[in-house]
Amino acid sequence: MDYDVLIIGGGFGGCYALHQLRKSGFSAHIVEAGSALGGVWHRNSYPGARVDSETPYYQLSLREVWKDWTWSQRFPGHAELKRYFTHVDKVLDISKDVSYNTVVVGADFDTVTAKWIIETDSGRIITSRFLVTATGSSIKRYEPEFAGKDLFKGIIVHPAAWPVSGIDLENKRVAIIGSGATGVQCVQEIAKQPGVKLTVYVRNVNIALPMRQREISELEQDSLKAIYKTLFRLARDSSAGLPCDGPTQVTKETTTEEREAWWEELWKRGAFNFQTGQYTDFLVDAEANRLIYEFWAKKTKCRVQNPKKRAILVPDKQPFPFGTKRSSLEQDYYECMDQDNVEVVDVKKTSIREWTARGIVTEDAPTALTNAPVFIEQQVDFITDFLVKLRMEKITSIEPRRSAEEHWKKTVQAIHEALLFSKSDTSWYVGGNIPGKKKEQLNYLGGIPQYLKECREGTKDWSNFNVVVGVGNAV
């Protein structure tokens, strides 16, 4: 099969890319490893899995898709996201151009034919002029190695491989290793199972924020839909894809009373408002950042009555600058961790030594991972415009010059160093969650509008690229 564009991945990015490329006259096709659309939402069915970007921003902004779709909650769960992608498929007729259960094992660019040669796990060969990798940042799951893990006689399951049919945890001893977003969501569900004895191994503190989950009526959404166009525009123009009316002054220009009142308002709103609505210097001024942590700790400590657990989950000393690691949204995480049937282990002090047939052994005693759709749409729009430009100018292939790549890398790292992100080295933002991986900023921290400006300015001419016009003609 031969296409103008081959897209790898059938999540938000792949679906929107296929739709936009079709509109621009390209023949396009998606190769999807799973059996359905949805990407991360097709793969994840673990207890409590749900989106942490609030309605209506975590969806495609296409009117033909949202006009007949109604969300049931402010933060929809994985089952509802699966139904949403079924709806997207029905409206946009995505599946007619998708190869499901197909894994790409190789992709090479043939300079003679100026085409990509893509090989799948079945041996099928696909060719295309352009290749779009819409695989997302969570496609490859990380499973740490532990001595003796193969000896364990119980069930070991990575959340991304949690069976759709579920696992019966009633009256079971359960261990959760990790306290990131997935760990938080699993704890909130598993800790409440009848007869469960839960042990949670915590490596890094999670400065989790209140979700403020609630049901949303169809009437409320119908009212919101009248201003969806404005809301989506505000989201696109915002730094993180989630609009918030934050203050324009720096922290030191405010009084304690003014700060506390504003933070209380953000806290009541829930979601990521406590982060996106902060004073302008919170990622630059360490003292301003410390004040935010102290407020968070004050609001959170009272929810954990057990002093040993409280010292692990809400330490007196700020563990890292707030906002430099993605905070998780929680509903009753701290109350669940405080339950008598839940044990909390600080693995920095009591590390995991090995696994045995019956469980996990620590060093001192045995005991039982931006609002994506908004950003994705803008990236796809940029890519589509770029491919149209190449087609109009009859350009066969294009590749960034090494000097341009190095300049971009330095730009990304320079912004990182100028902010308090440089003081936190355990975040997945810098690859800190993978042992042995080089620690460097993996995200552009200048915000979505500036990122797109950089992209468009960098491609307004071909000075940063090696360009081929017609096969074999380098410019």
Residue ranges: model-predicted function:
Residues 170-173, 315-316:
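Short, surface-exposed connector motifs at secondary-structure boundaries
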Residues 1-3, 157-171:
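A short, basic/flexible loop-to-alpha-helix module at the beginning of a structural domain
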Residues 21, 189-190:
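Aromatic pocket-lining residues of Rossmann-like dinucleotide-binding sites
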Residues 2-5, 10-13, 19-148, 165, ...:
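N-terminal FAD-binding dinucleotide-binding subdomain shared by FAD-dependent oxidases/monooxygenases
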Residues 173-189:
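Residues forming the flavin
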Residues 149-153:
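Active-site "gating" loop of Rossmann-like NAD(P)-dependent oxidoreductase/epimerase domains
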